[in-house]
Amino acid sequence: MTNIRKTHPLIKIINHSFIDLPAPSNISAWWNFGSLLGICLIIQILTGLFLAMHYTSDTMTAFSSVTHICRDVNYGWLIRYMHANGASMFFICLFLHVGRGLYYGSYTYFETWNIGVILLFAVMATAFMGYVLPWGQMSFWGATVITNLLSAIPYIGTTLVEWIWGGFSVDKATLTRFFAFHFILPFIITALVMVHLLFLHETGSNNPSGLISDSDKIPFHPYYTIKDILGILLLILALMILVLFSPDLLGDPDNYTPANPLSTPPHIKPEWYFLFAYAILRSIPNKLGGVLALVLSILILMLFPILHMSKQRSMMFRPLSQCMFWILVADLFTLTWIGGQPVEYPFIIIGQLASILYFTIILLILPAISLFENKLLKW
């Protein structure tokens, strides 16, 4: 009798995805982040579900309902902080996953890559709307500032912003719809993840060398299932250390003050994982220009398959490109730091230089270095 996992219509899909999947024999720990992102998504959906059971999306009661979750609900504080810090772990894994893709040339699977970029946008939108829900000062003013950016769109901008707000300012209607969208988006993300995996399994995984690995494949289970479990244990360890020892490390103290439309906080800033994009937004004095730069800072990822000039796929054997890649990483750290600083000298000029460097490295320097490295191959 044939094994049920190979014949059952539903189980065989799981079998081809996680058990008998042929995987390259040399993929490193950098390939663990896909499964870690899956675990993050599951953690976020489960903790979010339990939070939604006790949360009320009304301006009068939202803040106190979060307080009630933390004080009165059994392990409510744990669920709330796992959800808040789970978002941070999600973004750490996301950035490392994208960085891995850039370094090893995984973007040459362009359907998989483009779905991944769409996923990044969807996760960022979800995180932004989630940050608004506790209805603290930074929630309210963050929502006001970021939604207001859409007013920079010519002709329809103001109408669009008021339509999103559901009124003439961020208010009850805004909070209610943000809660609805924050609830539905993770399920849309889950569907997109399945499409992401579908396209990935059409081609098979990339590997550190960037070479075709068809001649040397091993089954996903038990080799990579065990490897993924190790990664998952380390992820949960890191998350629980954060949640149980310093749950507010990555949060903003202003969000422990209930939202007050009459009092603006001295420094409005988003969560740490948006700071690099926020710094790029602020580095351009023009509103529309800033918004375009903000969107392009993420959308530029879709250009990588077009900008790939090298004859080699991976950066493993390209030391000059490696050097430039790590300068780009350092530049992103600089932008993240600048995004959290007040708008004053010398931070303004540092932010502008870092923003210019970000786009220059991606659009000009990396392709130019790739062409130079192609020339070196002939020496």
From Swiss-Prot:
Q: What membrane topology is given?
A: Multi-pass membrane protein
* Record: residues binding heme b b566: 97, 196
**Protein location:** Mitochondrion inner membrane
Q: Does the keyword Iron apply?
A: yes
Record-annotated residues binding heme b b562? 83, 182
Indicate where this protein is primarily found: mitochondrion
**TM stretches of this protein:** 33-53, 77-98, 113-133, 178-198, 226-246, 288-308, 320-340, 347-367
In the record, what terms sit under GO molecular function?
metal ion binding; ubiquinol-cytochrome-c reductase activity
Required cofactor names: heme b
**Any single Gene Ontology cellular-component annotation:** mitochondrial inner membrane
Q: Does the keyword Mitochondrion apply?
A: yes
Any one Gene Ontology BP term: mitochondrial electron transport, ubiquinol to cytochrome c
Give the misc comment: Heme 1 (or BL or b562) is low-potential and absorbs at about 562 nm, and heme 2 (or BH or b566) is high-potential and absorbs at about 566 nm.
Q: Which family does it belong to?
A: Belongs to the cytochrome b family.
Name of the featured protein: Cytochrome b
Q: Which organism is it from?
A: Tamias minimus
